[in-house]
A protein has these predicted regions:
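Extracellular or lumenal secretory-pathway regions
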Residues: 2-319, 326-501
Length: 501
């Protein structure tokens, strides 16, 4: 039974991700050969490491400025009709803007391995000015994530127990009339939705016994727990430990994941290739990145995500590379091992987290941008647009400094009719991948830092700029660490200065 609650709270192979250098463009060739002689190139590489007390290390450990973190939610505008089988219609609400402070906790160096271990730590502070008229008190209708998640998990793992959930729902969740429930944005994201554990029914007690063991649920009082998307981990270190290369011996390997959760391979997917752990932890890039792109180990997606070079460009007077990311097509032979079974594969540019996170969640780009039109048309109210919904980032290649980044990821839930659950009994017979919310995590360097980047002959200044913005790329494609594994065990809170609204 306990395994069901991975939903609430539930890398590092010997292979290395090298940043192979292709033939540089004429422009960058001139920069590297004339403005950066060999000894300066060597110095830059050596400075872009995670050595103790270095400027890069300090910024890597705790970002000096916050990311802008925007959340857009989807309001179900026809909840009663949808509960009876009608097509679901959505209205986007947002953005709700937060300052996201990124840091690392429980840091330990291992000099013999040239490695460092740590736990990710994120703190969110509501930015009322950037949110405009939105306050968090707005009322929206969403599918009750706990009901849908529990129904899916129990049906898959312990189907003979599904009747207990149906009996417990009225007591746990206030006897909702449909699976689409009214919530405030503030409660859904941070303050928490109530879970009643007065244990007046034996089925209710079964679930409450599990909830009380689970740090993903915040105890409000003796009879009530609270559950939210971000609340329990706001300002709290992630329990899963990373071990990454410090890059002192080989600067090309800085940030390369050596172990994740004390393991050098995963045990999630059906083939060794998909279980590989390789790439960076997303929080630092080496100097002299190339058009080959680079890999990121997206821990909460249980997979490696690869960037793709798009073009060279002049970014406000700085020679730069533009990269993008998509999630590929599970139908491709190399990615087929990411499917939940050989027969059940989602369509392109989606990630099924059922096996990874123990919950029927699907990751995509916002509004199913670059995904199959079937997903876009299954619900009303979606309008995918490249300029608003793609993942894109621009990097000054010599220093590995991101000058602009837009990381946009949508989280969806698989909503299916279930004849054993009263609230799911009358849903449309066709399964739907229903958008819940999407995030836009971004940064653009201000003129202060851009002007220093333009002074390419100023090596020390250039390296320090890289240090300042290293943490601004943190999170990258590992955004799901903030929303998906609600069920992973959490540690004691730190960074008490954080708040939600």
């Amino acid at each position: 039974m306990r395994g069901i609650f991975r939903f609430f709270w539930s890398n590092a192979s010997g292979s290395k991700t090298h940043f192979h250098r292709k033939c540089p463009s004429r422009r960058n060739f001139l920069y590297s050969q004339f403005l950066f002689p060999d000894f300066m190139v060597k110095t830059m590489k050596e400075e872009k490491t995670l050595k103790r007390d270095g400027e890069v290390r300090k910024a890597w450990e705790r970002a000096p400025i916050p990311l802008e973190f925007k959340v857009y939610l989807f309001n179900v505008t026809n909840p009663n009709e949808a509960a009876k089988g009608a097509k679901i219609h959505l209205q986007q609400v947002g953005p709700f803007v937060y300052d996201e402070w990124k840091a690392k906790a429980n840091i330990t160096d291992y000099p013999k391995e040239d490695a460092v271990t740590f736990h990710m730590l994120n703190t969110f502070v509501f930015n009322a000015n950037k949110s405009g008229s939105l306050t968090g008190d707005e009322l929206i209708y969403v599918p009750h994530v706990l009901i849908v998640g529990l129904a899916s998990a129990i049906s898959r793992m312990n189907p003979e127990s599904i009747g207990y959930l149906d009996m417990a729902i009225p007591f746990l969740f206030g006897d909702p009339s449909t699976v689409f429930v009214p919530v405030t944005v503030r409660d859904l994201l941070f303050d928490g939705l109530p879970v009643n554990c007065n244990e007046t029914h034996f089925a209710q007690a079964i679930f409450c016994n599990e909830f009380q063991k689970n740090p993903g649920f915040v105890r409000k009082d003796e009879q009530t727990f609270l559950f939210s998307i971000f609340g329990a981990r706001n300002g709290t270190p992630d329990p899963i430990m990373f071990k990454v290369n410090r890059g002192l011996r080989n600067p090309h390997l800085v940030g390369e994941v050596m172990e994740y959760n004390r393991s050098k391979a995963q045990k999630v997917w059906s083939a060794a290739k998909c279980n590989e752990i390789r790439g960076t932890d997303s929080t630092i890039l080496p100097s002299f990145v190339t058009k080959d792109g680079f890999d990121v180990f997206a821990a909460d997606f249980c997979r490696v995500i690869s960037s793709k070079f798009v073009r060279e460009l002049d970014y406000k007077g700085i020679p730069a590379y533009e990269y993008t990311v998509d999630f590929g097509d599970p139908a491709d032979s190399e990615k087929h091992c990411y499917c939940t079974t050989y027969e059940t594969c989602l369509k392109k540019n989606t990630i099924d987290l059922t096996l990874c996170a123990g919950v029927p969640f699907v990751v995509s780009m916002p509004h199913f941008y670059l995904s199959d039109p079937e997903y876009v048309n299954a619900v009303g109210g979606l309008s995918p647009r490249k300029e608003e919904h793609e993942i894109v980032f621009v990097v000054e290649p010599m220093s590995g400094t991101p000058t602009m980044a837009k990381r946009r990821v949508q989280f969806n839930i698989i909503l299916s009719r279930n004849s054993e659950i009263t609230l799911l009994h009358d849903l449309n017979e066709k399964q739907v991948i229903l958008p819940l919310f999407w995030v836009d995590e971004g940064v653009e360097l201000g003129e202060k830092y851009l002007s220093q980047l333009r002074m390419l002959t100023g090596l020390p200044g250039m390296v320090n700029i890289g240090a300042i913005v290293i943490e601004l790329i943190a999170g990258g494609l590992v955004i799901a660490a903030m929303y998906i594994k609600f069920g992973r065990a959490r540690m004691g809170k730190q960074s008490p200065e954080g708040n939600n609204q």
